[in-house]
Amino acid sequence: MIKNQGDRYHLIDKNALEEKKLDSNELTEFVKSSGLIDIGKKYNIVSIIGSQSTGKSTLLNYLFGTQFDVQNRQQSVGQTTVGIWISKDVKNNVVVLDVEGSDSVERKSGENMVENQTALMALAMSHCFIINVFVNALGQHTSCQLSIIKIIMQQNLKLFQQDTVKHIIFVVRDWDEEYNYDEASRKLNGYLLNIWNEIPKPDQYRETDFHELFSVQVVTLVYYKLKNEFAEQTNQLHSKLANQQDPNFIFKDFDYEKNVRWSDMPQYLSNIWVVIANNKDLNLPNEKILISNMRCQQIKLEALEGVKDLTEDLQNRVRTQFVENFGQQCLSILGVAQKIYDKDAKDYHADVYKEKEKELRDELMNKFYTYFQRQTESLKQHYMNRLSENLETLKRESIYDLPDKLNEVDLLKVNFEESLSKSVIEKGLWQEQDHVGFFNQQFDNQLKSFVEAQLASFKQQLDNIIKSECDKIVSQQVLNISPKFWSQIDADYYTMISDKYSKYDALLSGLRVQWKQIDDYLSKFEEDSFHNLKQVIAVASGRFKDQLFQQFKAQFVRTEDGQPRNWQKTTEEEIFHIYTEARDKVFSFLDILRIRKVKFIRIQQTMKKIAKTHLAPFTPLKEKISYQISADTDSDDVVLNEVFYTQVKMQLAEDIDVQYQDAIQKHKQDFLQNIPKPFWFLLLFFMYDDVLRWMGNPLFLYPILIILCFIGFCIAIGLHSLPKLAFQTVFRTINQALLPLIFGGISKLKTS
């Protein structure tokens, strides 16, 4: 059961004195029910001290409209107020303390400690002291409460930071015009100054003027039964204490921010009384800081609870995907928490307020940083997925379009950095640049792998293109072998490969390939391209014999204007001359092909390596040749090695000789066609029995069998033209030697 009666409360009662503690629950209930909790920090506390039974409670009731118990004049004089009562001005934010009177006869000897404790409690709470003194007691030490004032002065120096003035108002009761106000004021100020000079002071206050720390006023009141005048004077005093519009308002420069909020006052006063009641050193700033710590901690937790739903919602969303404007949403939550915190905490001790504000921010920032880590991973995954999608699309693009496309792809890095910048609350706070660097490295590695894969595919295509171009270049020369065969191949190949080289170089640079790797790519390109040229030449060498034979036929069989030659009208000497000229020409071409090697030279131009062929004259195989591709000289370096050269020359010679024999036969056909046909039948009639006899003769039969076996063997080993050449030689000999003898004998028989 709380003990408040109306709007008053017994703050320090017998239980508080005996148990040395306050009932904070009852005090809290009073603070709520009386409306004190609503005034926050905007208040002043006025307490009254004085001797017992001097009308202190009555004066307070007149001044502030309170309802403190007053002494019934018809009863015996005694103690009315025990300890400290607390109440509030009915209209203004002035809290009033009615302190137990001093010199109480009810207090036993040695119990003046209670008076000191209540005075100290009043001092800890009050901004202004009203010292109630009767005019006829001005010269009395105890009546003027000088001992209590001494305690107040001493403790005031210890308890308070001296940036505000403590107000002391002497209210001199039962004043009459016959008294000298100036004399009374001088006397009271003299008492205070003497006390100030007597009390020990800290070093910083030794030279301090008393009036810098205390504001002293002397107010006189007539006898209370002079109601009108007494009421007017009490109203004037009340205005000084409660009316902020009064020019004489004593709390004009008061810093209300230093007050303890009434919502925290029960705990604050409980802590103070425990210290005072146990005669311990009281430290009011520490007590205020303690209360501020406790309340700001509680308010901080309330602020965290107030944004709990918002933080959990943000956490749930960031778990599934990255959140747009993550940083702004974090700031919004911080703002809500700050608003909740400021609403109740901003009036507490400034340092504590800032400390707990920082703790609130740090706790939220720690949560946000955890979310930020997940946000960052989601952003990385999102943009890496977009990169993969873009690269999959680029696989279908021409590789020469990739440099421009890669510039477009690079925008993903910019977008990632922008999204990440929107995910932070303060630039650099969460080391977002480290995440940007890691993402860029991961991004570039995937891009590099893609480029390498595309280059590998392109290199295969480029090899095929080079092979095709080399085949065109070589084939063009093979179709018309000439002394410029090698020089033209060299020039055409160099022109083609230079163009491809420069484009390949530009492509590699556009694809962000590193300089050293570009050199490696280009060197490999040069070597592979030259190897392709060698392969094409090697394959084309199989066509050399046929092409040379065709070029021989073109010169031997046809005239310069392309018309077929008439061998019947051409003499054998002319045929032989044409044959010799055409044969020597193609053999000279064959020798050109034989005595050349294909060599690779790398020429350094403007820090670039350019592939070029070099057609070197044949060097005897015993002499070692140094190559920039290979240090070895093998048969592959020679276009026509000795074995292949001999084989081609033999086959070419055979085919050429066949053409020559055909021409001779066509020339001789005119002579045989002049023999009458009946003569051939007559010759066969007279010689058939001789033919049969020859067939039965082994000397004739065995040579025929040997000749047939020779023909079969030549066909089996691929020298099918050799029997033909042998028979042509035999028949040519017969035509030139035997037939003239035969037909000459026949002519003689006809003559005889």
UniProtKB/Swiss-Prot annotation:
GO cellular component, one term: endoplasmic reticulum
Pfam families to which the protein is assigned, alphabetical: RHD3_GTPase (PF05879), Sey1_3HB (PF20428)
EC number: 3.6.5.-
Residues reported to bind GTP: G50, S51, Q52, S53, T54, G55, K56, S57
GO terms assigned for molecular function: GTP binding; GTPase activity
Keywords: Coiled coil, Endoplasmic reticulum, GTP-binding, Hydrolase, Membrane, Nucleotide-binding, Transmembrane, Transmembrane helix
UniProt domain GB1/RHD3-type G: residue ranges: 40-265
Ranges per topology, Lumenal: 696-698
Residue runs in coiled coils: 445-465
Known role: Probable GTP-binding protein that may be involved in cell development.
Name recorded for this polypeptide: Protein SEY1 homolog 1
